[in-house]
Amino acid sequence: MIKVFIAGATGWAGSAIAKGVYNEKGMQLAGGLSRFNKQENLAEILDFGNDEIPLFGTIEEALEQVDFDVLVEFTKPDIAKKNILSALNKGKKVVVGTSGLTNEDYTEIEKAANDNNT
C-alpha cells in the first residue's frame, strides 16, 4: 500500500488527485496540506464519508504526525519549494505538479533528492 500525502489537497487540482488516490486500490490517502482548512478532516471537506483523513497547515506538522511514502505537491511555487525540500530531507518521494519553479529551484531539489536517496 502506497501512502500518499497531498499538498494543496483542497485546491482544484489537489482535490481531484485526492479523490483519485482515495479511490485507487493499492493507495492510501494519508493526509493533506491546506493553508485554509488546517486542523480539519479532509474526508469531510471532500465528501468521502465517515473516514478521518488529517489536514495540516504546514509540512512540518505533517512530517511529524503522519506516516506517508509520497508527497504530491500542488501548491504555489514559493510554498512548493519549501514543502518539497522538507519532504526530501525526511526521505520521502515527491511528485511535483506545481508550475512556476525556476531552474535554480529544480537544481536545489535535484541535489536534495540525490543527497537523500529519494
Predicted regions and their residues:
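N-terminal Rossmann NAD(P)H-binding glycine-rich loop of SDR-like oxidoreductase domains
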Residues: 7-10, 14-19
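NAD(P)-binding Rossmann-fold cofactor-contacting core
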Residues: 23-48
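Short acidic low-complexity segments
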Residues: 51-65
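Rossmann-fold NAD(P) dinucleotide-binding segment
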Residues: 63-65, 70, 74, 78-96
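Rossmann-fold NAD(P)-binding glycine/threonine-rich loop
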Residues: 85, 89, 98-118
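Gly/Ala-rich phosphate-binding loop of Rossmann-like dinucleotide-binding domains
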Residues: 18, 22, 88
